[in-house]
Amino acid sequence: DHRLPSIVKVTSGSTPEIAEVVDQLYNQIIVAGTYKAESIRVAEAAKVIENTQRDVNIALVNELAMLFGRLGIDTEAVLQAAGTKWNFLPFKPGLVGGHCIGVDPYYLAYKAQQLGYSPQIILAGRHINDGMGSYVAKQLINLMSLKSLTILNSKILVLGITFKENCSDIRNSKVIDIIEELKNHGANVSVCDPCADKDEVKNILNIDLLPINEINISDYSGILLAVAHEQFLDLNLQLAKDRVIYDVKSQLDIS
């Protein structure tokens, strides 16, 4: 459980004396302890590369998922097999949003470009992850086509609007890219998210959320699990077996 007290806190200060005060302050609440960086610049850089590394790793598995899709290989099966090795990092493909992982790499890239250096891997990762919403929508459309289901005027149910599972934060959520792509192809999209604040979603994204207890699975030609909230994992999808179900996070039991 990665909560504030259980994560080592990197601290620093503008002077050695202030750095010590800050470090002692955090030590009062951080059970895992603190790490006093030698300067604020080092502490800030450490935080930025932490999120950038995660962004790049997710971009790698996203690209692999797109490749395996073309090869007709189950990405989840490949990751499970590769995960038997002690040195394999267990990242999964998915949408990268929020106010940290999808933003911090741009800080680093901007500073690098100010100094005359063009970061290749960082920006390549951002390019891949920023395009995943459109990719997911097109995958759903292609799967519907294979079942002779027309996307124009079809009813699509998108499960989840927040940027990650089991949280209410909608900042920089890439699910909106999926919704817009589906709408651009003429679909009628319903969105359900029991974790999100319906008023906030309406005010910021102009989307009316469908209450989870009003979902009628058989009404939809396509169902897309965008965010793996715990409430969604208990949905009975047996009525949707003749429809298209796209599970971004490979969490649903649709056997």
Model-derived features: positions:
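Structural/interface elements that position substrates and couple domains in central-metabolism enzymes
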Residues: D1-S255
